[in-house]
Amino acid sequence: MEASNVALVLPAPSLLTPSSTPSPSGEGMGTESMLLLFDDIWMKLMELAKKLRDIMRSYNVEKQRLAWELQVNVLQTQMKTIDEAFRASMITAGGAMLSGVLTIGLGAVGGETGLIAGQAVGHTAGGVMGLGAGVAQRQSDQDKAIADLQQNGAQSYNKSLTEIMEKATEIMQQIIGVGSSLVTVLAEILRALTR
């Protein structure tokens, strides 16, 4: 990085002062003016680094909050799925018990004809209960699919946020690198001036 490039990017009023030290572009620039320019550039770099640090901190807090809310939402959907599956199982079990009770009850009352009628009524009741269980199971499967989608979305979202944070860290390192380069250039200039 040449000093003239820095001066062109960030002009300072102190560049207008007369000097005995010529710059690479042929204009005069005093040692004090150059030091003030480097100091100004350094201060601006540090301000940018501090702002980026603060943004990264608040971003990280927000990222954690959003990730937590997504995980809670996924958990709630999964709990709903478990409840729906349990309800389907209860309906199926109730249908099987009702079928058995009707078969035994009508069989005891009506003999062989009652047993056949009991089985028919029991199977019909079991079928109706099975239909209700199927509806509940369908709802459970839909809720599970939604929970899986939410889980995948939460993971993808979290990955995207992490990648953004990595980019911000990379930018912070570049700012620090530019600052180090600036210090090196200043040291070289001061060494050249003291010869």
Curated annotation (Swiss-Prot):
Entry's localization field: Secreted; Cell surface; Host membrane
Keywords tagged on the record: Coiled coil, Host membrane, Membrane, Secreted, Transmembrane, Transmembrane helix, Virulence
A GO CC term attached to the entry: extracellular region
Top-level taxon: Bacteria
Recorded topology in the membrane: Multi-pass membrane protein
Mutant lacking the gene: phenotype: Disruption prevents SpvB-induced F-actin depolymerization in human macrophages without affecting intra-bacterial SpvB protein levels.
One Gene Ontology term from the biological process aspect of the record: protein secretion by the type III secretion system
InterPro entries (alphabetical): SctB2-like
Pfam families: SctB2 (PF05802)
Signal sequence residues: none
Membrane-spanning ranges: 90-110, 115-135, 170-190
Ranges in coiled-coil conformation: 44-80
NCBIfam families assigned: PRK15361.1
Family: Belongs to the SctB/EspB family.
Subunit record text: The core secretion machinery of the T3SS is composed of approximately 20 different proteins, including cytoplasmic components, a base, an export apparatus and a needle. This subunit is involved in the formation of a pore, called the translocon, in host membrane. May form a complex with SseB and SseC/SctE2. SseB is required for correct localization of SseD/SctB2 on the bacterial cell surface. Binds to the chaperone SseA.
Purpose: Component of the type III secretion system 2 (SPI-2 T3SS), also called injectisome, which is used to inject bacterial effector proteins into eukaryotic host cells. SseC/SctE2 and SseD/SctB2 are inserted into the host membrane where they form a pore and allow the translocation of effector proteins into the cytosol of target cells.
Protein name: SPI-2 type 3 secretion system translocon protein SctB
Originating species: Salmonella typhimurium (strain LT2 / SGSC1412 / ATCC 700720)
Organism ancestry: Bacteria, Pseudomonadati, Pseudomonadota, Gammaproteobacteria, Enterobacterales
Gene that this sequence comes from: sctB2
